[in-house]
């Protein structure tokens, strides 16, 4: 007995259900497209007009958008198409767009998505104070913000952020070199009560005055990165030890004025510090120079 012939081309077996015949909002969007990588969805929408409509409906309902999922570089026109209908975003990461992202590209997206809670703009050097103002004013639920390596962030921009973001918990200001102690002091006084994580790394303008004010106003601070803050010294670290009972990690590498005596109290509490105690450093150096590996116990 010969097996039945399978349908070919556009033929369809009687009673068969096509993929696009399944309920879009009840089945395809929540149970299928949500599990497909964004890069694959962009290819899928080229199959037909129906698939394009399905993908656009999915994009309109996105809660999280990370441009890195599209690729290391994403053209301006592609980003505009992807986010054209999105109005419910809660997380937005645009680091791969850093070479060209401007206020004109970003501000309309922020205006359509007031529910944003997490925004990553690291390295986006073409933005300005206008974009940060739109974010602060239009997204009152903002909790996490990365502005790392955004040289345009100055004291006035940070003041606007501190005034309008009551829910702010995590802030990355790495290499925002225009910021000085006065701006950080204002941030601490306005938003310190809720701050849990802060990076001020690679900023030679930040000193003990800023660190001490953070310590006094940020009782919930868990993580503080002061890497390369050359003006920070032992006084600032002692104040952290006194006023920040839940501090879990402290980064002070290349802070040459921070003495071990100020760090020891934090070490005893189990705070993770990226600088080894002097005795440990000496033993490692001895091991490297003299080849005493079998004889030196590095436990201190």
From Swiss-Prot:
Domain F-box: 19-66
Keyword Lyase: no
Keyword check for Repeat: yes
Pathway recorded for this protein: Protein modification; protein ubiquitination
Quaternary structure annotation from Swiss-Prot or TrEMBL: Part of the SCF (SKP1-CUL1-F-box) E3 ubiquitin-protein ligase complex SCF(FBXL15) composed of CUL1, SKP1, RBX1 and FBXL15.
Role description: Substrate recognition component of a SCF (SKP1-CUL1-F-box protein) E3 ubiquitin-protein ligase complex which mediates the ubiquitination and subsequent proteasomal degradation of SMURF1, thereby acting as a positive regulator of the BMP signaling pathway. Required for dorsal/ventral pattern formation and bone mass maintenance. Also mediates ubiquitination of SMURF2 and WWP2.
Recorded family membership: Belongs to the FBXL15 family.
Protein name in UniProt: F-box/LRR-repeat protein 15
């Amino acid at each position: 007995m010969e097996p039945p012939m399978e349908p070919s081309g556009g033929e369809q077996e009687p009673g068969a259900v096509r993929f696009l015949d399944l309920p879009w909002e009840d089945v395809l969007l929540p149970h299928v497209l949500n599990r497909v990588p964004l890069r694959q969805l962009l290819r899928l929408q080229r199959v037909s007009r129906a698939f394009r409509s399905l993908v656009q409906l999915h994009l309109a309902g996105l809660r999280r958008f990370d441009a890195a999922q599209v690729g290391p570089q994403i053209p301006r026109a592609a980003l505009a198409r992807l986010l054209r209908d999105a109005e419910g975003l809660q997380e937005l990461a645009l680091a791969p767009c850093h070479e060209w992202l401007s206020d004109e590209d970003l501000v309309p997206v922020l205006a359509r998505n007031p529910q944003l809670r997490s925004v990553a703009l690291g390295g986006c050097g073409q933005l300005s104070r206008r974009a940060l103002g739109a974010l602060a004013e239009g997204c009152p639920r903002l909790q996490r913000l990365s502005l790392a390596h955004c040289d345009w962030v100055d004291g006035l921009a940070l003041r606007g952020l501190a005034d309008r973001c009551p829910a702010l918990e995590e802030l990355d200001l790495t290499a925002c070199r225009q910021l000085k102690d006065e701006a950080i002091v204002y941030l601490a006084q306005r938003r310190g009560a809720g701050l849990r994580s802060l990076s001020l790394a690679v900023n030679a303008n930040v000193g003990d005055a800023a660190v001490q004010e953070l310590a006094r106003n940020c009782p919930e601070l868990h993580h503080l990165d002061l890497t390369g803050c050359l003006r920070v010294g032992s006084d600032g670290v002692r104040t952290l030890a006194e006023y920040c009972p839940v501090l879990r990690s402290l980064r002070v590498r290349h802070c040459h004025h921070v003495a071990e005596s100020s760090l020891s109290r934090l070490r005893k509490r189990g705070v993770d510090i990226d600088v080894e105690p002097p005795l440990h450093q000496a033993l490692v150096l001895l091991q490297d120079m003299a080849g005493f590996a079998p004889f030196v116990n590095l436990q201190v």
